[in-house]
Swiss-Prot record:
It is found in: Cytoplasm. Pfam families: UreD (PF01774). It comes from the Bacteria. HAMAP family: UreD. This is Urease accessory protein UreD. One of its GO terms (molecular function) is nickel cation binding. Keywords: Chaperone, Cytoplasm, Nickel insertion. GO terms for cellular component: cytoplasm. UreD, UreF and UreG form a complex that acts as a GTP-hydrolysis-dependent molecular chaperone, activating the urease apoprotein by helping to assemble the nickel containing metallocenter of UreC. The UreE protein probably delivers the nickel. The lineage of its organism: Bacteria, Bacillati, Cyanobacteriota, Cyanophyceae, Synechococcales. Required for maturation of urease via the functional incorporation of the urease nickel metallocenter.
Amino acid sequence: MIKTNWEGNCFLNFFNNKSSLENVDKTIFKSKSTSPYKLLKSTHDQEGRCILPVLHTAGGLVGGDLLEFEVNLEKNSKVLLTTSSAQKVYGSVGISKVNPKGTFSKQNNLIKILDNSHLEYLPQETIIFANGLYEQKFKVFISETSSFLFTDLIRLGRSSSGESIESGVFRSKLEIVRNNDLYDDWEYVDQIELSKASYVAKSGMDYMPVFGSLIWICEKDFSKSNINNLVGNIKKIFNETENNLSIGILENGISVRFLGSSSQDARKCFFCIWKQIRSVCGFCEPKYQGVWPLQDPMNY
């Protein structure tokens, strides 16, 4: 029997290149991957941060596809990880008597961030086409002296074509664990399921097709006043009601939710918040990446 589904994997190991001839140490990486993953050319910013776009060459996912994505940051690494295109999840295949509604496509993500390392994982949006079934899981282990920034942008259906999610489902589970010398401490857990029911519910998405999350977990000893100032600055820039934003302060970081009708508006909001996070951390100002949509004017 010929297999028709993808089973791809990608392993990325980042480490600080102390032998760099320049004044700033650069983060470099080693990788191992199979189709449909493809790594595009990496670059570096002025702080030696490795900027790596990842491409999914298959053009999308269907039921039964399984992707394994593993990222490891060695000590003193700085990484910006993104994707070169939106992830598309098509209507499920594999419908049978056993699975009358079809089969989920799945992606499992394992991330380990060692001491004094900083990962920004900013993939482009995931589009759930009509009847698409998708499940993603993230398990993140982070040291007490490291940070993790993650954005997750979901569009249910192609509203420009009058398409909704129909019987499709999006599931996501994010677990962030803080490592220390004595024990592992749960830092953040988030579990989401989006479907037609949540899309139409007045207390849910209320027919807003775009849902986004931004999670920033900072170093354990990061100043609480700086976190409060960060949230204050974000609220000064955005009217939370008008921009469909909800901002919360975590024990060590912030959580932001976006709900609206425009992926472009969500990207603009998250880019602005990213700039504010970079500023409060004392890092260089981020630049709009060349693999991202060109029509987005980032004028905040």
